[in-house]
Curated annotation (Swiss-Prot):
This is Arginine--tRNA ligase. The gene is argS. SUPFAM superfamilies: Anticodon-binding domain of a subclass of class I aminoacyl-tRNA synthetases (SSF47323), Arginyl-tRNA synthetase (ArgRS), N-terminal 'additional' domain (SSF55190), Nucleotidylyl transferase (SSF52374). GO terms for biological process: arginyl-tRNA aminoacylation. NCBIfam families: argS. It is found in: Cytoplasm. A motif ('HIGH' region) lies at residues 128-138. Its main location: cytoplasm. Monomer. Belongs to the class-I aminoacyl-tRNA synthetase family. It holds the Pfam family tRNA-synt_1d. Keywords: Aminoacyl-tRNA synthetase, ATP-binding, Cytoplasm, Ligase, Nucleotide-binding, Protein biosynthesis.
Length: 586
């Protein structure tokens, strides 16, 4: 509807250009917005104020000229010029009512558009290190990233969903070594477990699999393992130095092939679990992109070489540094250590270079808020490589903090005492988790109230919205039980009987849905959909409590049923964009 109004105004402006009222080269971006006060119409535009200066006319005179040249349409019943030159547009009754037929005809497609048609967008999200199960912190990034991808797809973008698998580097070595040390315990070798190793039960489980399938094949004695190692933190040493020494010892004693086998076992078990976990959460990907593949195909060295050739690298203290300060970063960054090993940042440069070369119009990274300092260096690298860094949009997601019984739930990944995403789903359900995660702006901290998420009350937003959908389904079951039938054509022909204020509010809210989707998609804010659904559910529940639907008069009955069926469809469409189901019974 908004697009149709903009088209009418653009036609009027074109006519004024042709007759000389407006200069022929006048360019203007016609914006039509919904009014907050219905006394000022349904929509308004300030286009006359924008055109007044280039036309050298008073804004009200321009507004009057535009109104006079508006094409005849059943869409606009009347216009009104307000203030310095605002044009208020009052919709015709049939235009307001036509949304019901549109919703019925379009069904699941209602609200979708082709705004982004022809443009490719990549959304990379979650990308948690495969060093353990996903925890509740990862859950918010998963729900948010999936919803952003679905919103962009809903407005016509060609969306590619990607998970970057950090299957190389120190954290993976810590995991592999942790698995081996737990395995040694199962073979009877007594060793102090490193302070900085991974301690979760899942490490025991992987170690048990290794022992069950391979017996003592990877067993080494404590004396040769501990010989010459520096002290760990409890003994006055440095925990980072100790775990690095233990990793080196594991590689030395096991040899490349055996160490790689243990490493791969840990990686694959956890990665399979992450895939299953996300699939159960309703989150799927087009590509699982391996960090290690970048090194294997020489992409990391190529990125470094391109930076070197462009004169953006220098050597200091035996390491290779990127002059990222030349491109707005707060300090220069190491891309290759003094031991010849490339850094995680170097892999990230190669990965983002690869993304740009794949031809996406936009690249969206969804990162945890703790990575905020990482954004300038990645953009600096892209700029140094001659890429358009504005194509990269990094969305930072704040942590979700769980509360149970009013008390904050503590979590820590390496110690193993964390709440997993799977445990959260088991406690509150997938739907509540998906909805609660996206009902605030991503940059806002989220206090996740577990008790509220499980409650069956109007205070629980996802329950309140789903209950509205289920209530409509219940009305339809009652209709069938009474032997009644709904005639959609008859109902839509009698919508003019819906004169109650509740009915008018619902009609207006339903008509806004496509605009809400476009607005939410363009600024990557799924919470706008959540807020809209809460508003629509509230409108419906108020209506439900005030009126009967299965009345004796067929015309009113069919009209009201057509209205609430439209509500049901829009709620289902909106919940679907957030990865939430629309149950028929509750």
């Amino acid at each position: 509807m908004k697009d149709q109004l903009q088209a009418l105004i653009e036609q009027a402006i074109d006519a004024l250009r042709q007759d000389g009222t407006l200069p022929g080269d006048t360019a203007v971006d016609v914006q039509v917005t919904r009014t907050k006060d219905k006394a000022h119409g349904d929509f308004a535009t300030n286009v006359a104020l924008q055109l007044a200066k280039p036309a050298r006319k008073k804004p009200r005179d321009v507004a009057e000229a535009i109104v006079a040249r508006l094409p005849a349409s059943g869409l606009v019943a009347r216009t009104e010029i307000a203030g310095p030159g605002f044009i208020n547009l009052f919709l015709g009754e049939q235009a307001k009512l036509s949304v019901i037929a549109t919703i019925r005809e379009q069904g699941e497609r209602y609200g979708r558009s082709q705004l982004g048609a022809g443009k490719k967008v990549q959304v990379e999200f979650v990308s948690a290190n495969p060093t353990g199960p996903l925890h509740v912190g990862h859950g918010r990034g998963a729900a948010y990233g999936a919803a952003v991808a679905d919103l962009l797809e809903a407005v016509g973008f060609d969306v590619h969903r990607e998970y970057y698998v950090n299957d190389a580097g120190r954290q993976m070595d810590i995991l592999g070594t942790s698995v081996w040390l737990r395995y040694l315990e199962l073979t009877g070798v007594e060793l102090p477990f490193p302070t900085n190793a991974y301690r979760g039960d899942y490490v025991y489980d992987i170690a048990a699999t290794l022992h069950r399938e391979h017996g003592d094949h990877y067993k080494r004695e404590a004396a040769e393992i501990l010989d010459g190692l520096p002290p760990d933190e409890p003994d006055g040493g440095d925990k980072e130095e100790y775990i690095d020494a233990m990793i080196a010892r594991a590689k030395e004693l096991l040899g490349d092939n055996h160490y790689r086998f243990v490493f791969e076992l840990g990686l694959n078990v956890i990665l399979d679990d992450i895939r299953d976990d996300l699939a159960e959460f309703g989150v799927t990907y087009d590509t699982w992109y391996s960090e290690r593949s970048l090194t294997d195909k020489g992409a990391v060295n190529l990125a470094i070489e391109r930076l070197r050739e462009a004169g953006h690298l220098y050597e200091k203290d035996g390491a290779l540094w990127f002059r990222s300060t030349d491109f707005g970063d707060e300090k220069d960054r190491v891309v290759q250590r003094d031991n010849g090993q490339t850094t995680y940042f170097a892999s990230d440069i190669a990965y983002h270079m690869d993304k740009m070369e794949r031809g996406y119009d936009r690249v969206i990274d969804v990162w945890g808020a703790d990575h905020h300092g990482y954004v300038p260096r990645v953009k600096a690298a892209l700029k140094a490589l001659g890429e358009d860094e504005t194509r990269l949009d990094v969305l930072l997601v704040q942590f979700a903090i769980l509360y149970r019984g009013g008390e904050r739930v503590q979590m820590s990944t390496r110690s193993g005492s964390f709440v997993t995403l799977r445990e959260l789903r088991e406690e509150v359900g997938k739907d509540a988790a998906r909805f609660f995660y996206v009902m605030r702006r991503c940059e806002q901290h989220l206090d996740f109230d577990l008790d509220l998420a499980k409650s069956q009350s109007a205070d629980n937003p996802v329950y309140y919205i789903q209950y509205a959908h289920a209530r409509v389904c219940s009305v339809l079951r009652q209709m069938e039980a009474k032997g009644l039938k709904h005639d959609p054509s008859h109902g839509e022909a009698k919508l003019s009987l819906l004169t109650e204020s509740h009915e008018q509010e619902i009609l207006a809210t339903l008509a806004r849905f496509p605009e809400v989707i476009e607005a939410a998609a363009l600024v990557e804010e799924p919470h706008q959909i959540a807020n809209y659904l809460r508003e629509l559910a509230n409108d419906f529940h108020t209506y439900y409590n005030a009126h009967q639907f299965l009345v004796d008069e067929p015309a009113i009955r069919d009209a009201r049923l057509s209205l609430i069926l439209a509500v049901r469809q829009v709620i289902a469409n909106g919940l679907g964009l957030l990865g939430v189901s629309a149950p028929q019974e509750m």
